[in-house]
Amino acid sequence: MFDFRPFYQQIATSTLSAWLETLPLQLKQWEKQTHGDYIKWSKIIDFLPHLTADHIDLKSAVKAETKTPLSSGERQRIIHHLKQLMPWRKGPYHLYGIHIDCEWRSDFKWERVLPHLAPLQNRLVLDVGCGSGYHMWRMVGEGAKMVVGIDPTELFLCQFEAVRKLLNNDRRANLIPLGIEEMQPLAAFDTVFSMGVLYHRKSPLDHLTQLKNQLVKDGELVLETLVVEGDINTILVPTDRYAKMKNVYFIPSVLALINWLEKCGFHNIRCVDVETTGLEEQRKTDWLENESLIDFLNPQDHSKTIEGYPAPKRAVILANK
């Protein structure tokens, strides 16, 4: 089990201090509801060695190194422990000569998003649906004062804490295992990211409002989500599954998405990138035993999903509160 008290101490004297009114009780309730695998996964972090990196790079990668390389045996033991936390979805990580080659090349997405952002230097950042935290570390690498990720998935918390331990226990990033709908409106974050979340929401406008409620006035929203071609009235509502995913509800056109944001009261809304997801960005690796993008597409026509919908295309939208 993880101790969240260091995070409480961090935020006690910050603009997030109001969160202490609800968060400790919420996390106590969360711990009561965890399942058996969480206990097993959390113990794996205890088995990882306490290494001190001589060089950490979060600016161009998520990488830690020592001047003296690990022995083959040490490296294999770490790999063994980390593979107990499979599947690794978002990465990659380069830790002491170990390459965690995750399903997603999340560095590709970061390189698309980063040039358009308001500088993250000294900003308080929220990453909603952060997964195991790859992008959080890249945000720290850009100089963010503190990055808070929220994701209720127990495995992601354990993966994050494993990586943190191997990054000299860096406290500038913290993962809180809650959903955005469980957060009280803090209006405290300078930048809020929601990447790969909106299409999983039954009520997308509620999600956009929840994101807005976490931003300071004029703070920046970074929204990345699936889109389809079309006009302001075009919204794809899959009848059953989309790319084998059961929980996909609404995929708007870029114009429809901008309209949603306007209705929620955002301003300065702009689409800065639209990209079809490629097979080099999402694929099977030794760190993932499950199916990946190639299995979700029509084998005869990769412009369509296995169900016949348009293949995944993702837009990045920026807006201000």
Curated annotation (Swiss-Prot):
It comes from Histophilus somni (strain 2336) (Haemophilus somnus). One of its GO terms (molecular function) is methyltransferase activity. This is tRNA U34 carboxymethyltransferase. Its EC number is 2.5.1.-. GO terms for biological process: tRNA wobble uridine modification. Homotetramer. It is an enzyme of class 2 (transferase). Belongs to the class I-like SAM-binding methyltransferase superfamily. CmoB family. It catalyses: carboxy-S-adenosyl-L-methionine + 5-hydroxyuridine(34) in tRNA = 5-carboxymethoxyuridine(34) in tRNA + S-adenosyl-L-homocysteine + H(+). HAMAP family: tRNA_carboxymethyltr_CmoB. Carboxy-S-adenosyl-L-methionine binds at residues 90, 104, 109, 129, 151-153, 180-181, 195, 199, 314. Catalyzes carboxymethyl transfer from carboxy-S-adenosyl-L-methionine (Cx-SAM) to 5-hydroxyuridine (ho5U) to form 5-carboxymethoxyuridine (cmo5U) at position 34 in tRNAs. InterPro entries: CmoB (IPR010017), Mo5U34_MeTrfas-like (IPR027555), SAM-dependent_MTases_sf (IPR029063). Gene3D superfamilies: Vaccinia Virus protein VP39. The gene is cmoB. Keywords: Transferase, tRNA processing. It comes from the Bacteria.
